[in-house]
């Protein structure tokens, strides 16, 4: 039976995302577990166009964009020490973490 832990990290700021990824990787490597990643996933770019003026001047517009950066970490055959190390990692406030446990036969 082969278990895996998949960790998906999302953030609007790539610097805080890379810092969080380094912290998780170093915590897992201290437990001597097998880790694959960080795998950079495609970023999503949302673009918004709004009028600058509230009334007239339709041709005068402003464009904004928001970028969502993502990384994937896969821990193969984790042990209880890995789970304990992951629970003790303190990450930045702007990083969203999704942890999935996948068990295979």
UniProtKB/Swiss-Prot annotation:
Q: NCBIfam families from the entry? A: PRK00596.1 (NF001861), rpsJ_bact (TIGR01049)
Q: What is this protein called?
A: Small ribosomal subunit protein uS10
What is an example of a GO molecular function annotated in this UniProt entry?
structural constituent of ribosome
Q: What does this protein do?
A: Involved in the binding of tRNA to the ribosomes.
User: Upper lineage ranks?
Assistant: Bacteria, Pseudomonadati, Pseudomonadota, Alphaproteobacteria, Rickettsiales
Matches recorded under Pfam families = Ribosomal_S10 (PF00338)
SUPFAM superfamilies found in the cross-reference section? Ribosomal protein S10
Keyword Ribosomal protein (UniProt) = yes
Record text on subunit structure and interactions: Part of the 30S ribosomal subunit.
Q: Which InterPro entries does its entry note? A: Ribosomal_uS10, Ribosomal_uS10_dom, Ribosomal_uS10_dom_sf
A Gene Ontology biological process noted in the UniProt record is:
translation
Q: Which family does it belong to?
A: Belongs to the universal ribosomal protein uS10 family.
